[in-house]
């Protein structure tokens, strides 16, 4: 009997380049493998005992004789290597067409329309690191009130503003204006509010980031759970990624540790259904900033907290741990990488030491959850429940 699934996404913790990585410029990417190599090994006793080191030969991650979990690596079926594409595929959406990207900034007519609708001028309009662009344009923004608009290798329209210049409520309204404007050929995956604070020369981003995503085009396993009166509890940016669709309750988080805290709080509530958590620091704080050392320490810090999650699990709980894409901090550039993702599953209702090999789509996870709760199957993915359940 399984009453609840705790599904944790370690954002960007990929595990080796996909066969088509050459099309994305990502040959040789291996986020967890290269981070481990960089640090001379990673201490991950909890994930190792679930089977992390048994998925693939990773230098510096312990391979145990008899893991107590089930383990695999997954290919991405969709085109793309971003957060939205990865998470959407997990719950049953195959994004055949990659979301639009803007390496040279957004078209002038689009920006002019945005300025007209918001009543504020735009500065920036280029591909940039969020921390660098507020250093470069923050002072001008504070003086003029113009919005800093920028993008990245991802399909994102990001708006940075100082919280004392553009109050949060206004910034979020501006993002909604952008979201409504960016449709059709310009339907970017996410509009992101990027508030910052501080004085010139020492601006820092705050934790009040908010994502305004496209609404998923059709029902996912989240909707199917919700329709059957099961709880879908979203932790971190999960609610934003799905634009709230299929979510019954949600909590936003400040960082990875807060994400684990909120997950544990939901676990204590003992509601039937799904706790779906995204831990974003790996990607946002360390992957994009090429900080391999901090990335590795972050993996180790999560592993310590994983001990608390395992202790809190009831006999009717199942735990899934995975990732949504890669972001190898040892690679040139600061973009996501097109990688396999690791997968670990554990619970008293599951068999031990099951090697599921390499699976063809992230959607297999969502299809398995649909079967666990006996709800309508999703459009894509093959359930592996029979292979792992006792």
UniProtKB/Swiss-Prot annotation:
Its main location: cytoplasm. InterPro entries: Alkaline_phosphatase_core_sf, DeoB, Metalloenzyme, Phosphopentomutase_DeoB_cap_sf. It is an enzyme of class 5 (isomerase). Mn(2+) 1 binds at residues 11, 324-325. It catalyses: 2-deoxy-alpha-D-ribose 1-phosphate = 2-deoxy-D-ribose 5-phosphate; alpha-D-ribose 1-phosphate = D-ribose 5-phosphate. Pfam families: Metalloenzyme. Mn(2+) 2 binds at residues 283, 288, 336. Keywords: Cytoplasm, Isomerase, Manganese, Metal-binding. One of its GO terms (cellular component) is cytosol. It comes from the Bacteria. It is found in: Cytoplasm. GO terms for molecular function: magnesium ion binding; manganese ion binding; phosphopentomutase activity. Its EC number is 5.4.2.7. Pathway: Carbohydrate degradation; 2-deoxy-D-ribose 1-phosphate degradation; D-glyceraldehyde 3-phosphate and acetaldehyde from 2-deoxy-alpha-D-ribose 1-phosphate: step 1/2. Binds 2 manganese ions. Its cofactor is Mn(2+). Isomerase that catalyzes the conversion of deoxy-ribose 1-phosphate (dRib-1-P) and ribose 1-phosphate (Rib-1-P) to deoxy-ribose 5-phosphate (dRib-5-P) and ribose 5-phosphate (Rib-5-P), respectively. Belongs to the phosphopentomutase family. This is Phosphopentomutase. The lineage of its organism: Bacteria, Bacillati, Bacillota, Clostridia, Eubacteriales.
């Amino acid at each position: 009997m399984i009453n609840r699934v705790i599904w944790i996404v370690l954002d960007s913790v990929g595990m080796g380049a996909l066969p088509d990585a050459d099309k994305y410029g990502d040959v040789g990417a291996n986020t967890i493998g290269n981070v481990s190599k960089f640090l001379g090994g990673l201490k991950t006793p909890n994930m190792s005992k679930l089977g992390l080191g048994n998925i693939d030969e990773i230098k510096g991650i312990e391979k145990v004789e008899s893991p107590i979990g089930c383990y695999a690596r997954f290919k991405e079926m969709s085109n793309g290597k971003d957060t939205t594409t990865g998470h959407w595929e997990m719950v049953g959406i195959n994004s055949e067409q990659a979301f639009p990207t803007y390496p040279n900034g957004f078209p002038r007519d689009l920006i002019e329309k945005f300025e007209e609708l918001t009543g504020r001028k735009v500065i920036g309009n280029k591909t940039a690191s969020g921390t660098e662009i507020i250093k470069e344009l923050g002072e001008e923004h504070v003086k003029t009130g113009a919005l800093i608009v920028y993008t990245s290798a991802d399909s994102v329209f990001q708006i940075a503003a100082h919280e004392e210049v553009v109050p949060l409520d206004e910034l979020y309204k501006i993002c909604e204006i952008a979201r409504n404007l960016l449709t059709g050929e310009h339907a970017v995956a996410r509009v992101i509010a990027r508030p910052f604070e501080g004085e010139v020369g020492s601006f820092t981003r705050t934790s009040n980031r908010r994502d305004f995503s496209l609404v998923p085009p059709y029902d996912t396993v989240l909707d199917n759970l919700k329709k059957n009166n099961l709880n879908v509890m979203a932790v971190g940016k999960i609610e934003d990624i799905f634009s709230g669709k299929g979510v019954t309750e949600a909590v936003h988080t400040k960082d990875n540790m807060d994400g684990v805290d909120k997950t544990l709080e939901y676990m204590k509530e003992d509601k039937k259904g799904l706790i779906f958590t995204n831990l974003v620091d790996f990607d946002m704080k360390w992957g994009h900033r090429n900080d391999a050392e901090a990335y590795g320490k972050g993996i180790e810090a999560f592993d310590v907290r994983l001990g608390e999650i395992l202790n809190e699990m009831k006999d009717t709980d199942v735990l899934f741990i995975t990732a949504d894409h890669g972001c190898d901090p040892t690679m040139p550039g600061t973009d996501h990488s097109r990688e396999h993702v690791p997968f670990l599953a554990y619970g008293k209702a599951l068999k031990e030491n099951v090697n599921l090999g390499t699976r063809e789509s992230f959607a297999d996870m969502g299809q398995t959850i649909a079967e666990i709760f006996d709800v309508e199957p999703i459009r894509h993915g093959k359930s592996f429940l029979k292979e792992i359940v006792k």
